[in-house]
């Protein structure tokens, strides 16, 4: 997996995304989420009973080079509930949790709620089964921290799960429509969703190399380019937050071959709910696979 560089020194500037400090009311639960999509689920369930800081929150900048600030360190130290992806995707959070003073807190680790095994794709939020499990764990944590308002958390959990079920239903529809379609990607970011959709993913060795920040082999690059030039795939997916000369070249080859190209991100856009973000990406994918050039 790509190496994420994190500086824990107290006076190092944040180079990628500046997370605004959480100003919690006296009786609010203080929550810190490593990624903003988990923070969004916490807000949907917690409502005005929680104050949420999402550390990685800028979809316009690459998430693979990240440094933290004293403010973020302090917020994590004060958090009652911490939410992270796990799966070695955000291992910096473990370091921050261990660096501060020990205190009682609940840690919701998505990788421990699903059937994740070392070596599996770490982009767990793109698996439709992940967020419902995370939502239940978050609601349980809120109810334990604030039992007086447990009924409210339970009610909002039901609403959130119903919204997340729209993703499950949409995935089933698209699997019936496009299942088996050969596609490819520059990185495995969308891999869990592609698998759930029943799509046939090609050039996975290339994707693994890019995820691990290593140079793909000449053979794998040639195979990827050939798939595009010979139109052996119906779609190219790329990580729009991270690009280099090689991925840009592959995008250009795909466009010249009139293969649809769509971008996905590892960070959720601002001012949108998780379910709407994912459903929007699924709509874009459906349109691309249904088009005349697919």
Task: Please provide the spans of the model-predicted regions.
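Extracytoplasmic metal-acquisition and chelation regions
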Residues: 20-294
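Bacterial N-terminal signal peptides
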Residues: 5-15
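Residue-level detector of intrinsically disordered/flexible regions characterized by low predicted structural confidence
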Residues: 4-5, 20
